[in-house]
């Protein structure tokens, strides 16, 4: 994980916990390499930090097939749309909106390049990052029905949380070095 090692080293001191967690969550566990790296790619894309995404993509491409990376990126793209749409319907809470057809194309959900269950796991992780309760519940039901355990779901969401925190922490790097007003006046 040479590229993510550089990301970890770039994290400022206030993000020390994130630095340690970033190393830990991508170690082998209950997820397959395709699941682990797919979740990492999808959630790094959802976090919208180019530097983090480039690092995760470089490491993922060394570990998994191109179809996994394509599916992870597709999950991030489709969920960027779906999470907004379904979160709106959920938040408004009106039956009239729930009855309206979405009329949004989401063919990749039905026919991913690699594993259907893995794609759903990537979508679940992105939905957790994006805060769409409806999508989280839906994708969690699909992956559990597809044979994944709650431990695997939990591991995926841990990866999502840490990747999101890493993206935020990279943004902090410039601010951590700026002296406070009190120190500057000192």
Swiss-Prot record:
Enzymatic class: oxidoreductase
An individual GO BP term: cell redox homeostasis
Residue pairs linked by disulfide bridges in the UniProt entry: 132-135
Keyword terms, alphabetized: Antioxidant, Disulfide bond, Oxidoreductase, Peroxidase, Redox-active center
Record field: catalytic activity: N(6)-[(R)-dihydrolipoyl]-L-lysyl-[lipoyl-carrier protein] + a hydroperoxide = N(6)-[(R)-lipoyl]-L-lysyl-[lipoyl-carrier protein] + an alcohol + H2O
SUPFAM superfamilies according to UniProt: AhpD-like
Record-linked InterPro entries: AhpD, AhpD-like, AhpD_core, CMD-like
Active site (UniProt): 132 (proton donor), 135 (cysteine sulfenic acid (-soh) intermediate)
EC number: 1.11.1.28
Pfam families registered for this protein in UniProt: CMD
Superkingdom per UniProt: Bacteria
Physiological role: Antioxidant protein with alkyl hydroperoxidase activity. Required for the reduction of the AhpC active site cysteine residues and for the regeneration of the AhpC enzyme activity.
Family the entry assigns: Belongs to the AhpD family.
Protein name per its UniProtKB record: Alkyl hydroperoxide reductase AhpD
The species this protein was found in: Anaeromyxobacter sp. (strain K)
Highest classification ranks of the organism: Bacteria, Pseudomonadati, Myxococcota, Myxococcia, Myxococcales
Gene, per the UniProt record: ahpD
